[in-house]
């Protein structure tokens, strides 16, 4: 049985793709063993991210660490997948000639053949084409062990934000046909999955073809998935404010299985910066979406993404971002220092903000966000939360970890038979990034 080591960088789409890589290899070899140490593997895969510069360089650092393994075992297969693979292509082989296969997100289904071609010819294989929906046509049926699962409904992005490499590494937006998505979800429900997370670079751009040739939009998809037997909770990530329509907002009013959590990246509170980023909305328009959502789902948990130090960002514009964060009171958010990505329009903009100032802005924004997160968590003490038990706690192997409807992690004492089940937990303690709870006896 082939032993496979895989390291995944970046977004949840990459996590989904990594699972699919393991699936196609398992189907090819009649099963595989996933190992946690690279030196135990027959196949080593790095599923990469190019959104941040440090993530990209970390890949080459990791490749350097596995090079001695290749020297000891020439039959070892080393592969680079994901967005760095799409962006760099043949350059990866030039920089690390011991790499055997390089493939992009849309060609992961070809991995087994690429390995065979490498072993037959002795030549490294590179395939970073964009065959779009073909990828999903060649993937084996989803198999999961947990109570929650990701389902990719679309890939790529056509928004071309000035700072982002995704359109260049994953291609333009394309949607899976409606029936394909529903079949996968129904199959997962039959395996005991209770929570579905609909996945895409911009899920609210979903336009899936139906059997009659008509197009199903994202709001309609949510309503259909809501009726699939066995599915108790629905999430989605990631969405774009530009296409967050009233019909999607109304789903939060009408669909109780749609959880009270939304990740909606805004990136900045400054209209000038948003325009330079080519985001396609203003801070006021973003606030209007949030206002409508909270009017119909007051307990909605909101998270977002922010970039500080974008080229030309002034102190006043950063203060506008701080004010927006305070006004909206996000439950949680992720802040990044801008890093120019090769080939993007923003990479050509003059950037005269000192790195030390960017770090200061990062820390100042995180301080405000974390204070609000801690405050909201404190308000949950004493409440009873319906939770999906995900598995063993990452903090304490003697405890279990569950997730609330509003995406909070709760650690508690329980028994293994509770894993993948929905249970009620009373919140007893609150920390900045997690909660502690106890089982509510029936």
Swiss-Prot record:
Which of this chain's residues are annotated to bind [4Fe-4S] cluster 1?
A: 11, 49, 83
Query: Which segments constitute the MTTase N-terminal domain?
Result: 2-120
- Reaction it catalyzes: N(6)-dimethylallyladenosine(37) in tRNA + (sulfur carrier)-SH + AH2 + 2 S-adenosyl-L-methionine = 2-methylsulfanyl-N(6)-dimethylallyladenosine(37) in tRNA + (sulfur carrier)-H + 5'-deoxyadenosine + L-methionine + A + S-adenosyl-L-homocysteine + 2 H(+)
Residues given in the record as [4Fe-4S] cluster 2 binding sites: 157, 161, 164
Name the keywords, alphabetized.
4Fe-4S, Cytoplasm, Iron, Iron-sulfur, Metal-binding, S-adenosyl-L-methionine, Transferase, tRNA processing
The protein's matches in Gene3D superfamilies, at most eight in alphabetical order, are given as: Methylthiotransferase, N-terminal domain, tm_1862 like domain
Q: Which GO terms describe its molecular function?
A: 4 iron, 4 sulfur cluster binding; metal ion binding; N6-isopentenyladenosine methylthiotransferase activity
Q: What does the record's cofactor remark say about binding?
A: Binds 2 [4Fe-4S] clusters. One cluster is coordinated with 3 cysteines and an exchangeable S-adenosyl-L-methionine.
Q: Where in the cell is it found?
A: Cytoplasm
InterPro entries from the entry?
Elp3/MiaA/NifB-like_rSAM, Methylthiotransferase, Methylthiotransferase_CS, Methylthiotransferase_N, Methylthiotransferase_N_sf, MiaB_methiolase, rSAM, rSAM_horseshoe
One of its Pfam families is: TRAM
Domain Radical SAM core, by residue range, is 143-375
Domain spans labelled TRAM: 378-441
| Cofactor or coenzyme needed | [4Fe-4S] cluster
Provide the Gene Ontology terms for cellular component.
cytosol
Enzyme Commission number(s): 2.8.4.3
Classify the main location: cytoplasm
Job of this protein: Catalyzes the methylthiolation of N6-(dimethylallyl)adenosine (i(6)A), leading to the formation of 2-methylthio-N6-(dimethylallyl)adenosine (ms(2)i(6)A) at position 37 in tRNAs that read codons beginning with uridine.
- State how it assembles: Monomer.
Q: What's the family?
A: Belongs to the methylthiotransferase family. MiaB subfamily.
Q: What's the protein called, per UniProt?
A: tRNA-2-methylthio-N(6)-dimethylallyladenosine synthase
Organism, as annotated:
Neisseria gonorrhoeae (strain ATCC 700825 / FA 1090)
Encoding gene per record = miaB
